[in-house]
Curated annotation (Swiss-Prot):
Motif residue range(s): 'HIGH' region: 14-24
Record's protein name: Methionine--tRNA ligase
UniProt subunit comment: Homodimer.
UniProt motif ('KMSKS' region) ranges: 344-348
Provenance organism: Pelodictyon phaeoclathratiforme (strain DSM 5477 / BU-1)
Cofactor section: Zn(2+)
Documented EC number(s): 6.1.1.10
Gene3D superfamilies membership: HUPs (3.40.50.620), Isoleucyl-tRNA Synthetase, Domain 1 (1.10.730.10), Methionyl-tRNA synthetase, Zn-domain (2.20.28.20), Nucleic acid-binding proteins (2.40.50.140)
Keyword list, A-Z: Aminoacyl-tRNA synthetase, ATP-binding, Cytoplasm, Ligase, Metal-binding, Nucleotide-binding, Protein biosynthesis, RNA-binding, tRNA-binding, Zinc
Binding site for Zn(2+): 146, 149, 159, 162
């Protein structure tokens, strides 16, 4: 393992087009903060960089819908989200904005450098243009009918009904969202980044991390590499964004694509952090220093941007340089998703718990603990109000909080608020089990945050059990020295727990620190080169040390009445969702206009057998099927990849519309359509005829 001396942690930039919700917190920001706080406890040199992604089409759409400027939109949500993160204890060293002057300059420097090296490719292409609005239309400004499922409200980038990723040119009857007019095709030129040029380098880079990156990260990355990396546009025809830094007619009205500019925010924000410290060159110690470890904390939907695209951009910059070369990420700990009460978080349906609103009602530390214990490391997890209540009451209040308060209160009452006994480190280890602390450290080091926090709570349970079983309130009457030994151990366990739990419930641990009679906070003791973590293994409170003299209830229990309004909200949201689903189902049940018997006879339905099946590149929902229809073969592109693997389809009997006119989809020809039925949950089930010697036979 590389002996790194510094660590730079970045977190995915939340889009400044809405408030962050608990799903965002669980997948990205809390795990990053747990790791950063743990590393600070160890005395490591680490910085945590984040910020707002403030460019892109959704922001302009929101601004136009509300009749305000894009700047007004991003100002609102940057402030809202940064305040929510701060209130939740997410300890950024710097939280920037991609609308800043430094960021614009940084992104333009990268563009200029790569352009001057001749790496970019210029391509002319035809895009939709709205004559009424006098502007080119990006994919999200175009709507129309999906060619796969015939949804009449598909967007230009994706059909929400069937999930197929689309381009605006694939839509049937496209219309502009700006004017409702039918757009026309016009030629425009854009700059493209040739990802394929760096495929070999990227494959070598990824191969170096086969043993230490998470499987989901490797799976997403390998899928893209196997398909072959393609050129990717890095400019758009928009007014909101970072201007292409060229004085030419071609660059007029063009900005950098947000995927290119946003990932460079990590660099520009680190620059701003250094400038804020008055050490403008210090950022290079973290970006251009091989001794610094770079970690990107993200959700699984962001993987390839951090394992392929950003590394490729940095490779392009490094090309031909002997100095000022950028580090590539050493690890990309991407999380799975956290759902909410059994359903996916959805801003569009308002099915979410927003972080700022949550913290107006409940303490941050209770949320941090609950989410850490449900951290979606290897699979999707679920946040529920009942689980939140149970963990707060049963684990934080009844276990950790109860032990701390009992220990402090008994010492204040029976030993005049002083630690009553000196003892050896071995005595503490017999109770605390330092091996457990080492196991917790290994869990944090390996990004296994749920394991780390769960093991910390196990120590709290053992401590609580130790106090209860030894009954110092009885011993004090018969053997005061024995009671003194028990309380000295208990108080030192309180001290150890204040350190072990600091990454997850920092505000509470600072309060425990004060109750134990220490000046300042744990935060104030943190400094590079000093390991507070190791101090958790040693007696921190010697005989005669005075406690604060008073205690407090660390966690207020959550009553049923406290979460009743939240459960009611869920009922209403679920009812609305079910109503929409029922309405959609009812709409589907409406029969189509009558046709004549002769028209029906024109449809040639036949039994076919699937010979081969494969996924379609850049179309996550499509399978390409080769079908044997009697003595003939046909190729069909079917939108079933979400529900069937290629291997599952091979050998199946299916029903094909054999005389359907050919249709071009994704530059490939589909010579028919297979029949499937949609279940109540939206899942598609392919119709499979049974019987022998029926291949090629007509359905009657």
């Amino acid at each position: 393992m590389h002996p790194f001396t510094k660590t730079l942690v970045t977190t995915a930039l939340p889009y400044a087009n809405g408030p962050v919700h608990l799903g965002h917190l669980a997948g990205v920001y809390l795990p990053a903060d747990l790791y950063v706080r743990y590393m600070r406890l160890k005395g490591e040199d680490i910085i945590h960089i984040g910020g707002s992604d403030e460019h892109g089409v959704p922001i302009t759409i929101t601004a136009e819908r509300e009749g305000i400027s894009p700047k007004d939109v991003v100002d609102r949500y940057h402030r809202m989200n940064s305040e929510a993160f701060s209130k939740c204890g997410i300890s950024f060293d710097y939280y920037g904005r991609t609308t800043s002057e430094v960021h614009h300059k940084t992104a333009q420097e990268f563009f200029t450098d790569i352009e001057e090296k001749g790496i970019f490719i210029r391509k002319s292409e035809k895009l939709f243009f709205d004559r009424k609005a006098d502007r080119f239309l990006s994919d999200r400004y175009v709507t129309g009918t999906c060619p796969i499922c015939n949804n009449t409200e598909a967007n230009g980038d994706q059909c929400e009904q069937c999930g197929t990723h689309l381009s605006p040119l694939e839509l049937i009857n496209p219309k502009s969202k700006l004017s409702d007019a039918t757009p026309e095709l016009r030629e425009t030129m854009h700059w493209y980044f040739p990802l394929g040029r760096f495929q070999d380098q990227l494959e070598s880079y990824v191969h170096q991390h086969e043993d230490d990156w998470r499987q989901n990260v490797l799976n997403y990355t390998h899928t893209w590499l196997k398909q072959g990396l393609k050129d990717r546009a890095i400019t758009r025809d928009l007014s909101w964004g970072i201007k292409v830094p060229l004085e030419s007619e071609e660059a007029e009205g063009k900005v950098l694509y947000v995927w290119f500019d946003a990932v460079l925010g990590y660099i520009s924000f680190t620059r701003e952090w250094a400038e804020k410290l008055g050490q403008s060159e210090r950022w290079k110690e973290y970006w251009q220093n091989p001794e610094c470890r770079l970690l990107h904390f993200i959700g699984k939907d962001n993987v390839v941007f951090h394992t392929l695209m950003l590394p490729a951009i940095l490779m392009a910059w490094n090309e031909g340089r002997q100095s000022e070369c950028y580090n590539l990420a050493d690890n990309v700990p991407a999380s799975e998703f956290m759902n909410f009460e059994g359903r996916k978080f959805s801003k569009s349906r308002n099915y979410a718990v927003y972080l700022g609103e949550f913290l107006e009602k409940f303490p941050a530390d209770t949320l941090r603990y609950s989410i850490a214990m449900n951290y979606p490391e290897n699979k999707d997890t679920d946040f529920s109000w009942q689980d939140f209540q149970n963990r707060t009451n049963g684990e934080l209040a009844d276990t950790l909080g109860n032990f701390i308060k009992r220990s402090v209160d008994f010492t204040n009452a029976r030993f005049d608020g002083e630690v009553p006994w000196d003892y050896s480190e071995d005595l503490l280890n017999n109770v605390l089990l330092c091996d457990q602390i080492d196991d917790i450290a290994r869990a944090y080091d390996g990004f296994h945050f749920r394991e780390a926090v769960s093991s910390s709570m196990d120590i709290a349970r053992n401590a609580n059990r130790f106090l209860t079983q030894n009954e110092p309130w009885k011993l004090i009457k018969t053997d005061p020295d024995a009671a003194a030994r028990v309380m000295s151990i208990s108080l030192n366990l309180c001290h150890a727990l204040s350190i072990l739990f600091y990454p997850v419930i920092p505000e509470t641990c600072n309060r425990i620190h004060a109750m134990l009679g220490f000046d300042g906070t744990i935060d104030s003791l943190i400094k590079p080169g000093v390991s507070l973590w190791e101090q958790a293994k040693k007696p921190g409170l010697n005989k005669g040390h005075r406690l604060l003299g008073k205690s407090e209830i660390l966690f207020t229990k959550i009553e049923d009445a406290d979460i009743a309004p939240e459960l009611k909200k869920i009922e209403l949201l679920v009812a609305e969702a079910e109503k929409r689903e029922a309405g959609a189902e009812q709409q589907k049940m409406e029969f189509k206009p009558l046709i004549s018997f002769d028209d029906f006879l024109k449809v040639d339905l036949r039994v076919a057998r699937v010979i081969t099946a494969e996924k379609v590149k850049k179309a996550a929902k499509l399978l390409k099927l080769q079908l044997q229809v009697g003595s003939a073969t046909k190729q069909v592109l079917a939108g079933i990849a979400k529900y069937y693997t290629p291997e599952e389809m091979v050998g199946k009997n299916v029903v094909i519309v054999a005389n359907l006119a050919d249709r071009t989809i994704r530059d490939d020809v589909s010579e028919g359509m297979i029949l499937a039925v949609e279940g109540a949950d939206g899942k598609l089930f392919v119709i499979e005829p049974e019987g022998e010697e029926i291949n090629g036979r007509q359905i009657q």
